Each structure stands twice: as C-alpha cells, then as structure tokens.
Swiss-Prot record:
It catalyses: RNA(n+1) + phosphate = RNA(n) + a ribonucleoside 5'-diphosphate. GO terms for molecular function: 3'-5'-RNA exonuclease activity; magnesium ion binding; polyribonucleotide nucleotidyltransferase activity; RNA binding. It comes from Streptococcus pneumoniae (strain 70585). Its EC number is 2.7.7.8. PROSITE patterns: KH_TYPE_1, S1. Residues 700-714, 725-737 have a biased composition (Basic and acidic residues). SUPFAM superfamilies: Eukaryotic type KH-domain (KH-domain type I), Nucleic acid-binding proteins, Polynucleotide phosphorylase/guanosine pentaphosphate synthase (PNPase/GPSI), domain 3, Ribonuclease PH domain 2-like, Ribosomal protein S5 domain 2-like. Residues 691-737 are annotated as: Disordered. The keyword Nucleotide-binding does not apply. Mg(2+) binds at D489, D495. Belongs to the polyribonucleotide nucleotidyltransferase family. This is Polyribonucleotide nucleotidyltransferase. Residues 625-693 form the S1 motif domain. Residues 715-724 have a biased composition (Basic residues).
C-alpha cells in the first residue's frame, strides 16, 4: 500500500495521519502528527486463539527520550522500564479499547505506541489514543471501533479541549474523556473541588469533541481499511449449557444470595465443584475432555453472572441484601500506629485500608525526568494490594499497573486539598495498605489517607472521601448501585469512582464493560455518589473533627529562612564544604532552593536554632549606622581591623578611635580586645569603615584666645594607602573676592 496522508485541524492544532509508509508488516499501523508531537502506533494480532479465560490485550506507551531532545538518565543511558506516567497513559488507552472487542474473542492483541517527537503543547497521549483506535480500525483485527479521547480543562469558567501547557497549569480541571460516537466509555479526572454540574458539562463537551475525531477516523477507514479477519470466538456447547442450567441453577441462585463474602464464595464454589466432579466423571474418556471441561467452567461463570444481574434488575436485591443506594457499614480510626507521623484505618464492609503518613525534608521529593522538563514531585500516594487481602496466595514484587493506577487516583483526589509549599514546606508520602478487599479498595485508601493527613497535622483544606458506583444494564433498563462490592464490580457493567469534599469533586475514574453510557446515567450516578460521599464525610468528621494543630512528636520539625540568591554559594561553600559542616555540627537536614529559601529540618528544635544562627551569620551583612560588639583582630599604623561577625571585618581608622589625637593605635587597643563600633561607611567594593569615637560623648568645643584662634591645633588624621582621603577644596582669598 502506498503512503497516504490525511489532514484536519482539531482544537486549534494541525492533525495529520500517515499510513502505508512505515511498520507495514503489522496488521495495522499509523503515524499521527499532532502539533509537533509524533506518535507511531502499530497493532498486531496472534494467528490463533490464546489459552486462558481472558482476552490477552496488551497496550504499551513508550516514551523515547530523544523525542524531547534528552538523554535517558542512569548509568546505561538507555530507556528501561516504563515511567509511572507512561504506565498510566498505557492504562488510559487500554480502558476505552478493551470493551470494543467481541465477547469470547481470545486472540492475543498488542498495540504499541512509540512517541517519536514530543510537543508539550500538543498532547502525545491523546495522539496515541487516536492512533491506537485508528491502527486497529484500519487493520484486519476484529475491533468494533473507532474510539477517541480528548483532554478537557476548565480555565476562567470556560471548558477547553486539549489545553496547552500554560492553560493546563491554570486549569481547575484535568479530565480525560474517551468514547465511541454514541457514548462515553472511559473517564479519568482530577479537579479542584468542582461541582457535579461543571463536571457533567465538561464530560459532555469532551464527548462532542470525541465525535469530531471519530468522524475523521471513519473517513480514513473508508479509504484504507482492510476487511476484518474471521476469527474463532469462545463459544460453549448450547446443549451442555441447557443441561447444566436445568440441573444446577437453583442451587447456584441460593449460593449467590449468601450475604457474607467468604461464606458466599464458599457456597458458590461448592456448587461449581459439585458440577465439575459430575462432568469430569461423565466425560473422563471423551476425546474432547479438555474442551468440555472448559465449557463447564465457562457455563458456571455465565450462570453466576446472569443470576447476580437478575437479582439486582428484577428483584431489586443485592447479593449482600442492601438497597441499591445503601452504603456498607463504616468505621474510621486514627492513630492506629505509634511512632509514625500519622495513620488512619478505614473500613467499609469487608474492605479495609490502612494509610500511613510520612513527612520529610523537601530534599526527599521525587525528581521526575521524562519528556516534559524535569520537576520535583512533592506529594506521593502509593497503593499496595497484598494477596492476603482477598484470602489468596499470589505474586509479590514490584507494583503492577493496577496498583500504580489506583495509587495515582488517590493521589489526584487528595492533592487538591493539600496546603501550598509556602504554608507547609514538607515532602508528603502516603502509603495505603489494603488489608481486606471486597470492592472499592481504592476509594477506601482515599478515606484512610484523609484520616492520616488530619491525624498527622497536615493542614488540608477539607476532608476528602471516595465512593465507587456501579451499573447493571440490560440495554433497555438500568440500575445504578452505590458502593459496589467485588461481585457487583466483577459482573456489573461499570465501575465509576467519585472522590471529593463537601464543596466539590476532586477526582473521577470510570471504566465500563459495555460500549458506552448516556448522560442520563452519568447524572444519576453523580447525584448518588454525592449523597454517599457526604455520609462518609460524616463518619470521618465524627472521628477527627479537624486537623490536629501540631505535628506528631516523631515528625521532623522545620524552620525556614530567606537569603539572597547571591548568598547561596556562601552557605553551600566550595564542593558543599560549608553546608556539610553545618549538618555535621548540628545534625539537621538542610534544603536550599534556587530562590534562596533555606529549609532546616530536625526533630530537635535546639539543633534547628543553632543551624539558623550559623546560616544567618554566614549571610549577614553589615549596615551603616548599626552598632556591633567587635573584636580587634589586626593592628596597623593607620588603624585597627575588627571582626564584626563571622568573616566580616571593618577598619577603625586611628582618627576614629577617640576624639583626642592619638599617635599610636596600641595606646588605645590591643589584639583580642572587644570594643563597640558603629559602621559609618561601606564603599562600592564592600569595604567597611567603622568608628569607636562615634559612640563616645563628644568633648566640649575648645575655648578661643583673644585673637579669635583656637587654643589647640586642629586634628588632621593620617590616611593609609587603602583609605585615601578625598580631596578637599577650600576657598582662597582670591576666590572669595
């Protein structure tokens, strides 16, 4: 296929798509140029159905540092594992694409996005999402798209699509919305306490922009799209399905309605084990034994799925007996742990999260060096999900994509209420340990995080709570569920997480298993979530009504001083010698930013005070008319040099030592003497002149003799070579005439 180019303008920037030139052996590939961001997307599919009971879709977003004209960090100077931002972007693309494959599709699919050039004002992640959908759509892979996504900002009361870097920094909203031309199917957002009405408006306007991108994709697919391949879908034997349903459906219905999670799981597993044993014996010698037993497992899963959904939509009964808008029992505890800087334990039904706060000097901030300019990340929220939380064994190691994503969601929700750096100059880390899970653990971690921050004395603007909403839809009717548990999440159509304060929303995340949801469903879900959020906030505020006025005794204390930027090098010293000496002498930690803000941290206030004194002395400047208790450090014929403070010396000229004439400096002072002096002059080179006599009482004026002349010869001070006197001009008799 020859190279073809398609072009349009979107959100004020040129959008160009190229096909048929590169990566031609992939099932589908495109180069997307948006502004000056360039992304290559290639989609490939395996020839055969993969084993396993899930769809093996892999989406990668690869940031190449050359795209921004940068070297990778580290010793190897080569890209390694994906950054957190790259992982989150890959998840962002995966989520709206995954529902667009047919039920039973099991071929492995990989969608690889490579950022080739990067323009911070033209969203590369959105170009990658566009490219992922388009590469799948023009390929022979059976993808029921296209989809598209946009970023949405809110600046000065205006909704902005794909905001620039400058607009994004001013925006009260950071929203990504994706969907088909018919409905929204993915949402990810952080917001500065915006109302449900503004969030809904942003979602709907974002979807209108999505439709523009989909229309452009459809134009390209019509021109270059391939015919879709015929692939085998996973189907179960219809006769076998009918046989099992007739014999065992009533047993499974009873098991599903057991209210307690572990007991319900045991009851349903007992039914499945019974059915499995029967058919293992029945077909033990059958040549298609493996296929039959795979079908048995799939049929039992479908039966449980259908019964949970029937209970909710028809009987209006949830598996644990709650109403559709009812929250599970809540409990909140602070100070669960001693010694740490703050802790909170939050329990909702059988979901429980422990959040632990750690405060540290700003030197502990995380340095983020990706495609954007390097910056320091002050707040971190990490989420851990051990397998024991669901009573299972499993893999332990580095956090996976799910843990990274849930941590980022909690981070967005809580970051909106944190104090500014000026108000609270600490690096802040929250770690959420999920101790039990039966759905909505990410939202429990947000609630526990609020408790830990308040207990730790972090002056947040307001408490934040989170709730997960669900959806059961049969195409014509739907039911929105409040506070979904694991079974409802697994068999439901939507997981819609909403976090916020009493004043507004701080984070949203929505994933669905159907191809989209309507504005009506969104409106209802947001309204139910608000009601539930307020109920949870009632419990949090009853546990800890306000932020504690002081930090924990184990938390580092902090004091800050401001110094001139040109004094930073004095405090640091050659090779860090001076600052290292201060740290060694006092035991504190010191951070200095490029604006001259010096932060001193220690659990010992006396150590902080000592370090402050040393630094203040290093950057102290003498001022004219100020008086100092100085020490004589050197004597010359023309005067004495005195130390005012630290490394700052001044000259007291012999003429400034006393009101009477003195021939020898040694007659008045000796090395080591302490004298009071007043600074009388600082020249442009910083040389300081001081005076002792300025602090002494002036002697009375001498009496005049009969001829009108002074009885004593006037004093004329001597001057040394470093202090040349200014020329003085006096009037001569000729001039006066």
């Amino acid at each position: 296929m020859a190279k073809q180019v398609f072009q349009t303008t979107f959100a004020g920037r040129e959008l160009i798509v190229e096909t048929g030139q590169v990566a031609k052996q992939a099932n589908g590939s495109v180069v997307v140029r948006y502004g000056e961001s360039t992304v290559l997307t290639a989609a490939v599919m395996s020839k055969k159905m993969a084993t396993g009971d899930f769809f093996p879709l892999q989406v990668n977003y690869e940031e190449k540092m050359y795209a921004a004209g940068k070297f990778p960090g580290g010793f190897m100077k080569r890209e390694g594992r994906p950054s957190t931002d790259a992982t989150l972007t890959a998840r962002l693309i995966d989520r709206p694409i995954r529902p667009m494959f047919a039920e039973g599709f099991r071929n492995e699919v990989q969608v690889i996005n490579t950022v080739l050039s990067y323009d911070e004002n033209a969203s590369a992640p959105m170009a990658a999402m566009f490219g992922s959908s388009l590469a799948l759509s023009i390929s022979d892979i059976p993808f029921d798209g296209p989809i598209a996504g946009v970023q949405v900002g809110y600046v000065d009361g205006q909704i902005i699509i794909n905001p620039s870097q400058e607009q994004a920094e001013q925006s009260l909203l950071e929203l990504t919305v994706a969907g088909t031309k018919h409905a929204i199917n993915m949402v990810e957002s952080g917001a500065k306490e915006l109302s449900e009405e503004i969030m809904l408006e942003a979602l709907l306007k974002g979807h209108e922009a999505v439709k523009e991108l989909i229309a452009f994709q459809e134009e390209i697919v019509a021109a270059v799209g391939k015919e879709k391949a015929e692939v085998e879908l996973l189907h179960v034997d219809a006769e076998l399905q009918a046989e099992i349903i007739a014999a065992y459906n009533s047993d499974l219905q009873k098991a599903v309605q057991v209210e307690e999670k572990l007991a319900r799981e045991a009851a349903t597993q007992a039914v499945k084990d019974q059915v499995t044993a029967v058919y293992e014996e029945k077909y033990a010698n059958h040549e298609e034994f493996d296929r039959i037993m795979r079908d048995v497992a799939e049929i039992l899963e479908q039966m449980e799925h259908a019964e949970v959904r029937r209970l909710i939509t028809e009987d209006k009964v949830r598996p644990d007996g709650r109403k559709v808008d009812e929250i599970r029992p809540l409990d909140a505890v602070v100070d669960f742990l001693p010694r740490v800087h703050g802790s909170g334990l939050f329990t909702r039904g059988q979901t429980q999260a422990l959040s632990v706060l750690t405060l540290a000097p700003m030197g502990e901030t995380q340095i983020i060096d990706g495609l954007d300019p390097e910056y320091k990340k002050r707040f971190m929220h990490h989420y851990n999900f051990p397998q024991y939380s669901v009573g299972e064994t499993g893999r332990y190691g580095a956090p996976g994509r799910r843990e990274i994503g849930h941590g980022a969601l909690g981070e967005r929700a809580l970051a909106q209420v944190l104090p500014s750096l000026e108000e609270f100059p600490y690096a802040i880390r929250l770690v959420a340990e999920v101790l039990e899970s039966n759905g909505s653990s990410s939202q429990a971690s947000i609630c526990a995080g609020t408790l830990a921050l308040m207990a730790g004395g972090v002056p947040i603007k307001a408490p934040v709570a989170g709730i997960a909403m669900g959806l059961i839809s049969d195409g014509n009717n739907y039911t929105v569920l409040t506070d979904i548990q694991g079974l409802e999440d697994h068999f439901g159509d939507m997981d819609f997480k909403v976090a916020g304060t009493r004043d507004g929303i701080t984070a949203l995340q929505m994933d669905i298993k159907i191809q989209g949801i309507t504005a009506e469903i969104l409106t209802e879900a947001l309204a139910q979530a608000k009601k539930a959020r307020f109920e949870i906030l009632d419990v949090i505020e009853a546990t800890i009504p306000e932020v504690r006025p002081e930090l924990a005794p184990t938390a580092p204390k902090i004091d800050t001083i401001k110094i001139d930027v040109d004094k930073i090098k004095i405090v640091i010293g050659k090779g860090g010698e001076t600052i290292d000496k201060i740290i060694a002498e006092t035991g504190v930690k010191i951070d200095i930013d490029e604006e001259g803000n010096v932060s001193i941290y220690s659990s010992d206030q006396d150590a902080i005070n000592r370090a402050k004194e040393i630094i203040a002395g290093l950057v102290r400047e003498a001022k004219v008319d100020e008086v100092y208790r100085a020490k004589v450090v050197r004597i010359e014929k023309f005067g004495a040099f005195v130390n005012l403070f630290d490394k700052t010396d001044a000259l007291v000229h012999i003429s400034e030592m006393a009101w009477t004439r003195t021939n020898r400096v040694e007659d008045l002072v000796e090395i080591g003497d302490e004298v009071d002096v007043k600074v009388i002059k600082i020249d442009e080179k910083g040389r300081i002149d001081a005076s002792m006599k300025a602090l002494l009482p002036r002697p009375p004026k001498p009496e005049h003799d009969e001829k009108g002349e002074k009885s004593e010869r006037p004093h004329r001070p001597r001057h040394h070579k470093d202090h040349k006197p200014k020329k003085e001009f006096t009037e001569t008799p000729k001039d006066s005439e």
